[in-house]
Amino acid sequence: MKLTCVLIAAMLLLAVCQLDSADATETGCKKDGSWCWIPSECCIESCLITCWY
């Protein structure tokens, strides 16, 4: 169940990062293809926070 949530969140984050690539690049969000796995001020972190907690 948790894995499904993480996969959905990852796809959502990737989509948002693609749409908001300019902002993501500025904050280093997509620097190493991390797709915002590291909590920072980029893209949507609330999705992962909801999944992890």
UniProtKB/Swiss-Prot annotation:
Annotated GO CC locations: extracellular region
Keyword Cell inner membrane: no
Signal in keyword set: yes
Segment forming the signal sequence: 1-24
Top-level taxon in the UniProt lineage: Eukaryota
Family membership: Belongs to the conotoxin O1 superfamily.
Full protein name: Conotoxin Cal6.27
Species of the source: Californiconus californicus
Lineage: Eukaryota, Metazoa, Spiralia, Lophotrochozoa, Mollusca
